[in-house]
Amino acid sequence: MKRLYRIFMMLSLVGLVSCDLDLYPETSYNEGNVEVNASTEAQYDTREEMLGLRNKIYGDWTKGIQEYGYQDFLIYTECRADNAYCGTNTAEIMQIEANKQDGENVNVTRDWGYYLTQMSNANQIICYVDRILANDPAMTQEEADRWSAEARCWKAWALFQMSRLWGSVPVVNTIPPAITSENIASVYYEYFPPQQPLDVVYSQLVDDLTFAIEHAPDVTDDKFVFTKGFAKGLLARIYAEEAIRDWNKVAQLCASVENDYGYELCENYGDMWAYTEADAVRNTKESIFEVQWTNKSEGNWVYMMFHRNAYDNMANYSWAKWVTPSRDLIEAYKAEGDTERMNTSIIIDQCAWQNYYPGDEYAFNHKVPTNVSSIIVMRLGEIKLLHAEALACLGDLAGATKLVNEIRARAKINPIKQPASQDEMIDAILHERRLELAFEGHRFFDLVRHGFDRAKKIHDEMPQKDEYWQDRLPLTQETILMPVPQSALDDNPTLVQNPGY
């Protein structure tokens, strides 16, 4: 009945609907090969229009990454584990910390739409570039391949984030044709596609990133460009996931990122988030991909969600901040004597609230210290620890230990001895990733990657260890994933709610 109703509603639009991509829902995607449906009218005709779309990739990142891809993602990754309290009494983030989220959650709803929109925008390049190459002699094959590769990196990042949050999701691959009375039934599932199982999702990720590894730009000094290095690093992350796991491929990809593109660890951990009176640091030799702002009169706004702007000290500092560092994380740094990473990741300051600490000694996330500080999406330190993880899972504990100790040496703390067992090595790597990558969006999924029991133990024990955590519903296999937003279910009757919600 719902399908018939939808078809009726679509028929009512025939004659009114052009193939403007903004007219169909953000859940409206189809599986299959990336292509423009033969009956889809051309939206773009020239190289200049395609260049504008390519540039829009990066413009969109400076906007959407702040709220959806960083701020919200830290709630899912840091506050669902042991790194951070949610920070305020905002209902939607309190629900996620307490494992009480539902399909009406504001963050869950907006983030679902954000990731689908990014894939849709990427498809405007992927689906049209060959047509423009054939019709506009100003475009070269190299440009077409490069811009498609950059769009595929964008799309793969969004799809991977989405799959970790929701599991089976719609796979974005085609631009639906205009609706006519003749095709209304056949295009239904292009406008209202079902979720795809993880093997389909991951197959798409591998396809897109394999293309990007061949055709994306080479690495340059500009780290706000999708490159071969980023594509390999993202594919390494993907092959570490249970649904497609291949530790040999993870190790090979990480080794290539480490050795083939000129990346190096910064001498000091804090160099990546440093700033002077004139400007913030960007494009360090360790950075693989970062989102950049260069104009202090505009810049990012997301700094205000976590602390102050070092260039305008009292601006937006009258209300409690999100993602407050936990006592457990601070103690983990102190137990290692790890002042280098602690003092970069966490700053102690005075404030007018006392939600988790006394107001004269309050802890804040300090990974976005100014409104022109970059958000680092991928860097070499993470890839080295992912490489260590792969080696440990392949039984090379000596190789894994060596990589961990490279990271510890940069942090100016003592090396670890080679653990006696694989499980102990994994624990050591997860601990190191926690200290190295705090507030970069990894912790919860690091734990999940190595088994439900690890994630559940840490998730469930926090309220018993520290009264400042909210009481949490026990983590279950089902609540590792977020609920599908109710609004998405209402808009697309082919979607089904995730189990447990």
Language-model regions, residue ranges each:
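Bacterial N-terminal signal peptides
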Residues: 8-16
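Long, intrinsically disordered, low-complexity segments
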Residues: 18-21, 44, 85-87, 115-118, ...
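Membrane-proximal, proline-rich intrinsically disordered regions
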Residues: 19-75, 254, 472-501
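Short, surface-exposed recognition loops and adjoining beta-strand edges that mediate ligand/DNA contacts
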Residues: 30-31, 68-91, 169-181, 217-305, ...
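Conserved, well-structured interaction surfaces
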Residues: 42, 46-55, 59-64, 88-166, ...
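Flexible, polar/acidic helix-loop-strand segments at domain edges
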Residues: 95, 175, 325-380
